[in-house]
Design a protein with these regions (language model features):
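Short, glycine/acidic-enriched loop or turn micro-motifs at the edges of active sites
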Residues: 50-52, 110, 136, 175
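Acidic two-metal-ion nuclease catalytic site recognized across multiple nuclease folds
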Residues: 1-32, 181-212
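Active-site-proximal helix-loop-helix substrate-binding element of RNase H-like nuclease domains
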Residues: 139-177
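Active-site catalytic microenvironments for nucleophilic, acid-base chemistry
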Residues: 121, 140, 158, 182-186
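Short, polar/flexible loop-turn hinges at active-site or ligand-entry regions and domain interfaces
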Residues: 122-128, 163-165, 188
């Protein structure tokens, strides 16, 4: 049985008061401006840790996030939340930390879908945020390294990126954040000066991939 089945409509328990308050505050917030230059934009790398890669069967174990502000990466500006049997508090903390900044993931087909599914099952909504997927953006910005959608470890090797622990929500988030820093630098140098430009690059690459 899917581990989220106990949270489906009709059996979903009430949210803890603290989590409900954080979610309500987030829902009242305003989305960030996508036209600001990168050094004025707060980007948040969001990553998950799960028991496996099966969206229907595997369980979300933890969420992590690292903020990049002013094109500056500080490991202390981070969030890590292991999720127990009730993920409500961890999800609420993620919303509070990430806010309405662009949420940057690597492999949205898994991480985004998993997060949206858990949010819907436990909190009865999917966060309406701007998602960006480095798995698509990196080959568009650095075709000299890879031209297709490759694994995170491949990009880490290309850039000499290291982290304190692989296959850990925060450890991999730190690696992704370092790649995002490189992506922001290359994007700025090539005239993609804001989040809106990066969104268009990703959208164009996905469209071209579908039409090939």
């Amino acid at each position: 049985m899917n581990w989220l089945s106990r949270f489906v409509s009709g059996t979903r328990p009430e949210l803890p008061a603290a989590a409900a308050a954080k979610i309500a505050q987030w829902q009242e917030g305003e989305r960030g401006e996508q036209a600001l230059p990168h050094f004025e934009t707060r980007y948040v790398v969001v990553n998950t840790e799960a028991t496996g890669l099966n969206l229907d069967k595997d369980r979300l174990l933890a969420v992590a996030a690292i903020a990049i502000e002013g094109r500056s990466l500080k490991p202390s500006n981070a969030l890590y939340r292991p999720l127990d049997d009730d993920p409500a508090e961890g999800l609420a903390d993620l919303l509070e930390f990430a806010g309405h900044a662009p949420w940057v993931v690597f492999n949205a087909s898994f991480n985004r879908k998993l997060l949206e599914r858990v949010f819907e099952a436990r909190c009865d909504f999917e966060p309406d945020v701007t998602w960006m997927d480095l798995q698509w953006l990196m080959p568009a910005l650095f075709p000299e390294f890879h031209t297709g959608q490759v694994r995170l470890v491949d990009w880490m090797e290309s850039f000499g990126v290291e982290t304190f622990q692989r296959h850990h929500a925060l450890g991999d988030a730190y690696a992704i954040a370092q790649l995002l820093m490189a992506a922001l630098g290359r994007a700025h140098d090539t005239g993609a000066i804001n989040a809106r430009s990066l969104i268009e690059i990703e959208r164009s690459r996905r469209w071209n991939h579908r039409t090939v």
